[in-house]
Design a protein with these regions (language model features):
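Nucleotide/phosphate-binding catalytic cleft detector across ATP-hydrolyzing
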Residues: 3-187, 204-206, 215, 226-252, ...
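Short, glycine/acidic-enriched loop or turn micro-motifs at the edges of active sites
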Residues: 192, 255
Length: 261
């Protein structure tokens, strides 16, 4: 839980961490188990703030039902070479929405960059003069049923969902600096059932994806190899597992089964 400061910054007031149940690869399989997980985590976080209740919830979502693509759109300024205003910009962004199926919903439309009369590299064209405005946008879409179920299960705890956010974007906001986004960076967040990826270029998300493989698959593989029960294997993995950075040049071909990438 957090409070928004006077300059828009977040001040963390409390956190609640509980073991997740009822979700498989980003999809709800047992709504009651998920509801109990959400309730328990919120109760734990509220211990830090007393009797106060959150005014709203921003929930991150993952899962292979989420897809993304980059689109381009252009629109002429009706004022010819007049100032570009926010109304024209909103019209431009709405036009960048791709055609979605009956069970699909647009989650995010994030401008990557604008062009005004052929001039590239513009972050915010509002107030500039120009007759033709173009945008390249990163669009994230998801299964509308899955997204609605996510909102439904959270709101059964009497909390109000203000917005759903792509999990990898939330991870990036929590871990990256502005300079890292500008230089170019990849965020890889390995969860239990999925791995979430987002690529930043010149300060904006350029690519995002969800891979249906996570830590749970590693636990199962270890369980088979070690011939130990799943719960014991998970404990061993968490307690003793490490990831050691190794230079690519120090790897031998046979160590990667000739699959060098």
């Amino acid at each position: 839980m957090a409070r928004v400061g006077t300059e828009g910054e977040l001040k963390v007031l409390g956190t609640g961490v509980v073991e997740s149940h009822g979700i498989q690869k980003g999809r709800i399989e047992n709504i009651e188990e998920v509801r109990e997980t959400v309730r328990a985590s919120m109760e734990e976080a509220q211990r830090y703030i007393g009797n106060g209740a959150p005014s709203g919830v921003y929930a991150s979502v993952s899962g292979t039902h989420l897809t993304s693509l980059n689109t381009k759109e252009e629109v002429e300024n009706p004022d010819d070479v007049g100032d570009i205003n926010s109304k024209l910009l909103n019209r431009l962004l709405r036009g960048s929405f791709p055609d979605v199926g009956p069970n699909q919903e647009v989650l995010h439309v994030i401008p990557i960059g604008y062009q005004v009369d052929g001039m590239t590299g513009i972050r915010n064209p509002v107030g500039l003069h120009g007759s033709l405005v173009e945008v390249e946008a990163h669009v994230v879409m998801g299964d509308s049923v899955v997204l609605k179920n996510t909102v439904k299960v959270i709101e059964t705890t009497k909390a109000s969902v203000k917005s759903l956010v792509l999990h990898s974007l939330a991870s990036a906001e929590a871990t990256l600096t502005g300079d890292e986004k500008e230089m170019g960076v990849v965020v890889v967040d390995i969860g239990g059932g999925t791995t979430d990826i987002v690529v930043y270029r010149q300060g904006q998300p350029w690519y995002s994806a969800v891979i249906p493989v996570g830590g749970s698959q590693l636990t199962r593989d270890l369980s088979v190899a070690l011939k130990t029960p799943m719960h014991m294997t998970e404990t061993l993995k968490v307690k003793f597992g490490t990831v050691m950075p190794v230079s690519y040049t120090h790897l031998r071909a046979h160590e990667t089964r000739h699959d060098l990438v």
